[in-house]
């Protein structure tokens, strides 16, 4: 019998299994030669889908950025990330292949890796052995050393931004917060994730990005060895205070030499903190030298020679455009002057690194593309007519996209037609609040997943102080590139979307916007049509000024929270009594414009209200108690005649996700007519409001518990939530209708949908690992 058929008795026909590819997909979406398939993840700046080359079958991760849904600042960070990824070619850094675009979308074709996030790996395995932790740590340090050698600071290192390939080797992703730190200048933008951010960043002080990365590396190493974070608290203000003090418990099972390394990296004083060079000479780091790691072997280098350029006419327009996206070379006259200088400087190093990348991997137009009928198909960003190192112009490619023009208003600097068209269209772009609403991640998974926060409006990386270029050697060595990958997302809009709003120029200033949230820290939900984004709620005042205030507030919150998949924690707000006891004298940081400190005052409690009519108070109280008793693993206590305190804790699943939900239930009489007496003489039911207030724990689980209680109070016979909670107690995972197929980030395709929109990945008392904002997951 053939494996492809099934015989039936009595002359019944054979049933053939369907052919795996009976016919090509009717509505297949293409980005260049890549056919878009399943969604891999969702980040702050875009969705990520799996792309498969239509001829070679090569897999890539395609990040889809909706330019109409993101603020100009976020789009500018995407352009900056593109430029930075062009600078970095290292075996442990995620690689950028190509960039495509049309009027509405930007498509980043990234390396695809199949091992997922280091965070998920750590949650699954628990704390790692010192040997395995050292392997990961050495790969991270190797990649960081390469980045820092070219003045690139990541600024958002955390296990969620570290991907694993099929051989469990590290790929650093999400350079959305990365910045060039030129010369001896310091950075000013407070960005990152509070659990991994260093004290000087939290305080809002100027800081050295390289030393900030070292602190984050120390926290990551601690998490690898312990399975928990050194600083953690359900209350955001308390968490930030712990980070500023820098006091943490060192478990006894960590090897003594590794303990000294951790204390040297997680050091409050930046000047005393270990540098990369000191880390690489540390005994514990060197202890792994006998452990072979082919990925750490130095790859064959490529020497990049620098020379002076006698005239502006020899400057490559594509390279200049990439340098402008970096944000620290805005003074065009100074940039041209430094490039023409005979002295060695940072500008020339960056210029020739980008030029070398362009010459070795030229971006040409695709050949033999599949036939498409898209109205506005994605077009590849191809090179402009390129100058050789000897000033001779190379043959021009046959494409309208590769022509260059001279921008008379910018001193005659060459500007590619693509960028010039975008600048011409920018003046027509709508600047409504809803037009800049959605913020997805900036990591290649999402991410790139992370926005940079700033209180004062600053374009791009304008917060970085521009210092004089430090001398650099005339030759730079670039390692040959190796295999890489990564990606994660949600159902993206089709590349052929007919929407015609014109995009703004990626290089133009943009607000540091993000995703407007329906409540202070609620998770943004995908719209029914799959478009990633939501419309912000009206401002309290309802006026234009209020809308602007609301937009700015949402931008601030989103900038702090970063990627939706890991930053959904319901932060606790300090009480009025606590805040009244704090003064600039008792806490000097309150007087500073630190984004961490200011964010606290913007948060509010999470509450759910239920109005009940024609039910007496005694009946409502009885129904609430009955609902409490019907939910497994829920305990309650009576605070007063009309108040209850409840706690729900699931007993199934890994201990790392057993964060209890604590909430309070208050019953109050609403305004309304006096209840009329019943025929039997008892008073009739009035109008009562039942308020459920989350005290601590995962927001998503809190909502599910409240839905179950509401079903009881409304006398609903169909109560699927009760069964869901029971399944959860037994370790089963459920996915509510409409929940995107994502987990922890919520990366789609992950098996645990219950975590997809949980506010926090979080822990039990003895073993817990927290995501960037420390929000515990169920």
From Swiss-Prot:
Activated by phosphorylation on Thr-189 by STK11/LKB1. Its main location: cytoplasm. Residues 362-383 have a biased composition (Basic and acidic residues). Residues 430-457, 509-533 have a biased composition (Low complexity). The gene is Brsk1. Keywords: ATP-binding, Cell cycle, Cell projection, Cytoplasm, Cytoplasmic vesicle, Cytoskeleton, DNA damage, Kinase, Magnesium, Metal-binding, Methylation, Neurogenesis, Nucleotide-binding, Nucleus, Phosphoprotein, Serine/threonine-protein kinase, Synapse, Transferase. It is an enzyme of class 2 (transferase). It catalyses: L-seryl-[protein] + ATP = O-phospho-L-seryl-[protein] + ADP + H(+); L-threonyl-[protein] + ATP = O-phospho-L-threonyl-[protein] + ADP + H(+); L-seryl-[tau protein] + ATP = O-phospho-L-seryl-[tau protein] + ADP + H(+); L-threonyl-[tau protein] + ATP = O-phospho-L-threonyl-[tau protein] + ADP + H(+). One of its GO terms (cellular component) is nucleoplasm. Its cofactor is Mg(2+). The modification Phosphothreonine is found at residues 189, 529, 535, 583. Its EC number is 2.7.11.1, 2.7.11.26. This is Serine/threonine-protein kinase BRSK1. Residues 314-356 form the UBA domain. Phosphorylated at Thr-189 by STK11/LKB1 in complex with STE20-related adapter-alpha (STRADA) pseudo kinase and CAB39. Not phosphorylated at Thr-189 by CaMKK2. In contrast, it is phosphorylated and activated by CaMKK1. May be inactivated via dephosphorylation of Thr-189 by PP2C. May be autophosphorylated.
């Amino acid at each position: 019998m053939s494996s492809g058929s099934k015989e039936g008795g009595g002359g019944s026909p054979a049933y053939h299994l369907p052919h795996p590819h009976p016919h090509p997909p009717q509505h297949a979406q293409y980005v260049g030669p890549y056919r878009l398939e399943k969604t891999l993840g969702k980040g702050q700046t875009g969705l990520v889908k799996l792309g498969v080359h239509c001829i070679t079958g090569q897999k890539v991760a395609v990040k889809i950025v909706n330019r109409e849904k993101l603020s100009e600042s976020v789009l500018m960070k995407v352009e900056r990330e593109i430029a930075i990824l062009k600078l970095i070619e290292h075996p442990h850094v995620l690689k950028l292949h190509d960039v495509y675009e049309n009027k509405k979308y930007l498509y980043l074709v990234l390396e695809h890796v199949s091992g997922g996030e280091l965070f998920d790996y750590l949650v699954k395995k628990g704390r790692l052995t010192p040997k395995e932790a050292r392997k990961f740590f050495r790969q991270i340090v190797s990649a960081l050393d390469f980045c820092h050698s070219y003045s690139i600071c990541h600024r958002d290192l955390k296990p969620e931004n570290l991907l694993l390939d099929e051989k469990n080797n590290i790929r650093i992703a999400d350079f959305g917060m990365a910045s060039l730190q030129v010369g001896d200048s310091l950075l000013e933008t407070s960005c990152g994730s509070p659990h991994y951010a260093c004290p000087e960043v939290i305080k809002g002080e100027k800081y050295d990005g390289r030393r900030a990365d070292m602190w984050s590396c120390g926290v990551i190493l601690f998490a690898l060895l312990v399975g928990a974070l050194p600083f953690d608290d359900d209350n955001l203000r308390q968490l930030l205070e712990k980070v500023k003090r820098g006091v943490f418990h060192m478990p006894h099972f960590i090897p003594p030499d590794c303990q000294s390394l951790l204390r040297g990296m997680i050091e409050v004083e930046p000047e005393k903190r270990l540098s990369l060079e000191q880390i690489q000479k540390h005994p514990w780091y060197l202890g792994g030298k006998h452990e072979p790691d082919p990925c750490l072997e130095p790859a064959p280098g490529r020497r990049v020679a620098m020379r002076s350029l006698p005239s502006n006419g020899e400057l490559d327009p594509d390279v200049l455009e990439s340098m402008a996206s970096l944000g620290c070379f805005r003074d065009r006259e100074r940039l041209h002057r430094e490039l023409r200088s005979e002295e060695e400087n940072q500008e020339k190093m960056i210029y020739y690194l980008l030029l070398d990348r362009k010459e070795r991997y030229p971006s040409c137009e695709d050949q033999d593309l599949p036939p498409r009928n898209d109205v506005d198909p994605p077009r590849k960003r191809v090179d402009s007519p390129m100058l050789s190192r000897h000033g001779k112009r190379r043959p021009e490619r046959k494409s309208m996209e590769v022509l260059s023009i001279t921008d008379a208003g910018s001193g005659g600097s060459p500007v590619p037609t693509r960028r010039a068209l975008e600048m011409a269209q920018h003046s027509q772009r709508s600047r409504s609040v809803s037009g800049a609403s959605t913020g997805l991640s900036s990591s290649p998974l999402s991410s790139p997943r992370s926005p940079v926060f700033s209180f004062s409006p600053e374009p791009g990386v304008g917060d970085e102080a521009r210092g004089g270029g430090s001398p650099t050697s005339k030759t730079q060595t670039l390692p040959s590139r190796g295999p890489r990958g990564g990606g994660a997302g949600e159902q993206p809009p089709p590349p052929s979307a007919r929407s015609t709003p014109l995009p703004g120029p990626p290089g133009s200033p943009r607000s540091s916007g993000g995703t407007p949230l329906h409540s202070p820290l609620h998770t943004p939900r995908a719209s029914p049509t799959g478009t990633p984004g939501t419309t912000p709620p009206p401002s309290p005042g309802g006026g234009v000024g209020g809308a602007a205030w609301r937009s700015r507030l949402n931008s601030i919150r989103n900038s702090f929270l970063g990627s939706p998949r890991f930053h959904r924690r319901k932060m606790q707000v300090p009480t009025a009594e606590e805040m009244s006891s704090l003064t600039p004298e008792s806490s000097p940081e309150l007087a500073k414009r630190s984004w961490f400190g200011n964010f606290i005052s913007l948060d509010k409690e999470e509450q759910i209200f239920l109005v009940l009519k024609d039910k007496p108070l005694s009946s409502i109280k009885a129904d609430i108690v009955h609902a409490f008793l019907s939910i497994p693993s829920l305990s309650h206590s009576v605070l007063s005649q009309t108040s209850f305190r409840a706690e729900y804790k699931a007993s199934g699943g890994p201990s790392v996700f057993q964060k209890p939900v604590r909430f309070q239930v208050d019953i109050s009489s609403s305004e309304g007519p006096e209840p009329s007496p019943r025929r039997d003489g008892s008073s009739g039911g009035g109008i009562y409001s039942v308020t459920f207030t989350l005290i601590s724990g995962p927001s998503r689980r809190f909502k599910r518990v409240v839905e179950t209680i509401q079903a009881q109070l409304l006398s609903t016979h169909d109560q699927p939530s009760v069964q869901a909670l029971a399944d959860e107690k037994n370790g089963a995972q459920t996915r509510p209708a409409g929940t995107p197929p994502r987990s922890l980030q919520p990366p789609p395709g992950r098996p645990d949908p219950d975590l997809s929109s949980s506010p926090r990945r979080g822990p039990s008392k003895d073993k817990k690992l927290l995501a960037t904002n420390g929000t515990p997951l169920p």
